[in-house]
Swiss-Prot record:
This is Bis(5'-nucleosyl)-tetraphosphatase, symmetrical. Belongs to the Ap4A hydrolase YqeK family. It comes from Staphylococcus aureus (strain NCTC 8325 / PS 47). Keywords: Hydrolase, Iron, Metal-binding, Nucleotide-binding. Fe cation binds at residues 21, 50-51, 127. Hydrolyzes diadenosine 5',5'''-P1,P4-tetraphosphate (Ap4A) to yield ADP. Can also hydrolyze Ap3A, Ap5A, Ap4G, Ap4U and Gp4G, always releasing ADP or GDP as one of the products, but it exhibits a marked preference for Ap4A, which is mainly exerted at the substrate affinity level.
């Protein structure tokens, strides 16, 4: 799918505010890709489409989870977790996107996971730091992403803040988010490469 078609699809489906967020994620991911030698066309496509299913009916999302066998564990969660995996499945099976990196970046943009590809990392970070975000402490994360040279450390910090937020709100934390946090935790002295 070319980027113009992706933008057209997203604009037709998403509320204006969410569509603009998606464009900002794509733009932010491109900037990060230029810093970290990523694929700008892949991150642009994933950025534009990452929230394509965010407002889909929850019943429809559960149906997609079952239809494409995305994992029964997902059936315990709402749209905040489901929209990524559901969107990736729809983009693959209904829109013919077959680039695994783009699909994985869409699938895990909210939760993260262990051993993310560079494209996944760039979308995960861009979704958190795009200019429209006003999350407390986001400027520190932006500085880390743009100026401190480590995607992995940035992912760890985002995951840590996300998990702490969810715990404070008594919201169940998705297992892949915990796995992501643990995997990118530098305090255990594992060495990782961006």
């Amino acid at each position: 799918m070319n980027i113009e078609k992706a933008k057209r699809l997203a604009k037709e489906k998403l509320p204006e505010k969410r569509y603009n967020h998606s464009l900002r994620v794509a733009e932010t991911a491109i900037k990060l890709a230029e810093i970290y030698d990523g694929d700008t066309s892949k991150v642009e496509l994933a950025g534009v489409l990452h929230d394509f299913c965010k407002y889909d009916d929850l019943g429809k999302m559960y149906q997609i989870v079952r239809q494409y066998e995305l994992g029964n564990d997902l059936l315990s969660y709402g749209s905040e977790i489901l929209h990524g995996p559901v969107c990736a499945a729809i983009m693959e099976h209904e829109y013919g996107i077959n680039d695994e990196e783009v699909l994985m970046a869409i699938k895990y943009h909210t939760t993260g996971r262990q051993q993310m590809t560079k494209t996944e990392k760039l979308i995960f970070i861009a979704d958190y730091i795009e200019p429209g975000r006003t999350i407390p402490g986001v400027d520190d994360i932006r500085d880390m992403a743009y100026n401190q040279g480590s995607l992995d450390k940035t992912i760890y910090e985002i995951s840590k803040r996300t998990v702490l937020f969810l715990i404070q709100k008594d919201i169940t934390v998705y297992n892949k988010t915990i796995d992501c946090l643990n995997y990118y935790n530098y305090s255990d002295e594992r060495i990782k490469d961006d």
